[in-house]
Design a protein with these regions (language model features):
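Bacterial N-terminal signal peptides that target proteins for export
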Residues: 1-7
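Large, well-folded core regions of big proteins
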Residues: 55-58
Length: 353
């Protein structure tokens, strides 16, 4: 096993986030304070430029857009998480106003039935998952987001969003693009699991049986090579969803497990930063989850992965402070890169003990 004893996150129950609302002790690795060599002066400069760029891209309605994805709750939520990764909240910090405006945009797109999706959303459960994650983090960092009215709106939207996730789980244990319990894929499922983890951290009740079923589904999607297939039917592994699969098992409180060891090993073989053969498809999505998986694995896994992805992202920053993802756009790529690069700061509750 490649685990050290320093804890980095409060993880949920084995095969469940909320059994009796108790949190087990997690024998994890990275400390809640960044190690001396994790954050460099060069990284600080890169992050500062990226935060400035991202702030400037916010639209008048509080949203961020990307490529063909206008008025998008997923990109907006990720952008706000990136700003919060610097330690700011909706009520304090240099980027507080931008976070508040983004939060208001997300809340304005929260329907009575709990679904968070802008009008143009296609396959809204991805956006719903990221939006619920953002609401959970905002609620956890500020006990509601600042003023009383916003606090009440945030709490109500978060609870309704969690209940929608719970009632749209399908019989296999997963979720897919639309909020109906019909079919499932591992990618959308993992997005919901992380959202539920954040909500649970913020004190929102999450049904144990929902997470039990989700973990079982994710386990059944793992291939013999350690990677994860897209759906339960036979399929090949791909590293971005495999990174997400490993991270989700950690977030479900599974620390020492053959499935995790196999998944971490697969990522080292197939997707290590700087590996020429690693596919660039879904690059930022994949590394968003991969760095979390390695962060949770700790020890030599984190020690090898972190400086490599840090330097790779630094080298890829454009002159204006952004990163580019052709299908989705620079706001998305920059938000994802910032979340990755600021992870050692441990400001977001999901990355704290």
């Amino acid at each position: 096993m490649r685990r050290s004893t320093l804890a980095i996150l409060t993880l949920a129950l084995h095969a469940g986030l909320a059994a009796a609302q108790e949190t087990p002790e997690a024998p994890r690795s990275a400390q809640n304070n960044a190690a001396q060599d994790e954050i460099t002066p060069q990284l600080d400069r890169v992050v500062e430029r990226a935060l400035e760029y991202l702030s400037e891209q916010q639209q008048s309605d509080g949203s961020w857009t990307g490529g063909r994805f206008g008025k998008n709750v997923a990109i907006t939520s990720l952008a706000c998480l990136a700003l919060m990764g610097d330690g700011d909240t909706p009520s304090r910090g240099e980027h507080a106003q931008a976070i508040r405006r983004g939060l208001d945009f997300v809340l304005e797109n929260a329907a009575e039935n709990g679904l968070i999706a802008a009008e143009a959303a296609n396959g809204p459960m991805y956006g719903h998952g990221f939006a619920t994650l953002f609401l959970g983090e905002a609620y956890g960092m500020t006990a509601g987001g600042g003023d009383t009215a916003r606090s009440a709106r945030l709490h109500e939207a978060l609870v309704k969003a969690v209940r929608l996730i719970e009632r749209t789980q399908n019989d296999e244990g997963g979720w897919r693009y639309n909020p109906v319990p019909y079919d499932a894929d591992v990618s959308v499922t993992i997005c919901q699991v992380m959202a539920l983890r954040s909500a649970r951290n913020a004190g929102i009740e999450v049904k144990k049986e929902v997470i039990d079923k989700a973990v079982d589904y994710i386990r059944r999607c793992q291939n013999t090579d350690g990677g994860f297939k897209y759906q339960l039917e036979t399929g090949s592994s791909a590293w971005p969803r495999s990174a997400a699969g490993v991270a989700s098992l950690f977030y479900a409180g599974i620390y020492e497990d053959r499935a995790i060891d196999q998944g971490v090993g697969y990522l080292h073989r197939v997707a290590a930063p700087g590996t020429p053969r690693a596919s660039r498809a879904h690059y930022f999505y994949g590394h968003y989850y991969a760095v979390q998986a390695m962060y949770l694995a700790g020890g030599d896994d984190w020690g090898a992965w972190w400086p490599a992805i840090r330097e790779e992202l630094i080298a890829g920053q454009r002159d204006d402070g952004s990163w580019e993802d052709r299908p989705v756009g620079p706001a998305y790529a920059t938000a994802m890169s910032l979340i990755i690069l600021q992870m050692p700061k441990r400001y977001l509750p999901i990355f704290q003990k």
